[in-house]
Amino acid sequence: MLSGNGIRHILCAAALLLVAALAAAAPRVKPGIEVLRERNFAGLEGKRVGLVTNPSGVDSQLRSTIEILHDAPNVKLVALYAPEHGVRGDIWAGGKVESGRDERTGLPVHSLYGDTRQPTRKMLEGIDIMVYDIQDVGSRSYTFISTLGLVMRTCAEMGIPVMVLDRPNPLGGRKVEGSLVRDGFHSFVSQYKIPYIYGLTVGELARMINDEGMNRGQNGKLEPLKCKLTVVPMEGWERDMLFNDTGLPWILPSPNIPYAETAICYPSAGLCGEMYNYLNIGIGYTLPFATFAEQWVDADKLKDKLDSYHVPGVAWRTIHYQPISGRLAGKLIHGVQYFYTDFEAATITLTQFYVMQAVWELYKKNPFSGANDRLSMFNKVCGTDFVSKKFGQTMKVSDISGYWSADVAAFIELSKKYYIY
């Protein structure tokens, strides 16, 4: 029989072998920054370059795009532009990002999530081209794609070209869900008339909003502007790939998306999470967007109710935990964690609505009834008030599912014009 030390030695050796194997395996997908580098930075040579990025802008060896461009002898990186969470990712969700200087490079950093969300003309003085390199999460309400559009608008006004370094959509390139944004509901979290899950890479999306006249500002009411746009494509990416199929390391693009799987969970629970005092969705715990729980929930009853719906592609388990931070910090809460057994079959954005339906049937708790200061944000993120009104009346998924899917087929057809892969 092996001693405890012997077992530990074997486990350590196995772990080292696994690390070595992972290091030796080349990623299946080459992100845009690596393709650009292999092309000797074609399009940037001798130009003064601005860069919109955050910690997710790295190559497959974890080297930052900031450092890559800063050290390239034929590129002059002159300024950085900070989206939500900042260039170095040190600002919490919704926190104001200040302008200043990057400690590592000494470059000026202009905030695009502070006093203004669209770069001013003064911010762009002294650059010849703007580069964008941020890992997208594939959901309309994540603010990075809105920042991209506003950057493209100012660049269009000033005649400055934009180069997007493409990256994988972690939800793949085939899943499309949700209604288009309705007039009157455009905002920084629903800036374009696209579905909630749009099934495009950020480079493909940039081409679409540029060519289809969708870049109409935060409120969707401005005249569309078109910039001179170049997309540096990936190599090896295919539409049916989820992020873990790419072989690339996942670098959290924001604090609550720590794992590639969390990008799938975000659209599955994030809308529900906008109703802040309703259900905990794992924020403040180790499973952001992956749970639905509260102190007053009977986990077994909730799971049994959800099982009775036979939701395609979704499985549930009971969970009991104490959030580490937030309004329920240190309190024991109970509920369910969900898993996708068939990602293709699942309509992931409806997962949260099945949970809300079950909670209504068990506890008669309706997050949309009465005065609620979060309802406006829910509608903005949803891109419509139809869902909150209709679902709030009946609390039945079947009463909104047709509306939610009505725009999908036409959008997929439009998208095909902009497919790079």
Give residue ranges: language-model regions.
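Glycine-rich, aromatic-lined ligand/substrate-binding cores of catalytic
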Residues: G236-I319
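Glycine-rich, charge-decorated loop segments at or immediately adjacent to ligand/cofactor-binding or catalytic sites
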Residues: R88-A93, M163-H186
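Short internal beta-strands
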Residues: K76-H85, L165
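Conserved functional hotspot residues or short segments at active or partner-binding sites
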Residues: F292-G402
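Conserved anion/nucleotide-ligand pocket segment
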Residues: F185-Y266
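Glycine/threonine-rich flexible loop motifs
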Residues: D136-L148
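N-terminal signal peptide c-region/cleavage motif recognized by signal peptidases
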Residues: V19-A21
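Glycine-rich oxoanion-binding loops at beta->alpha junctions
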Residues: V97-I127, S139
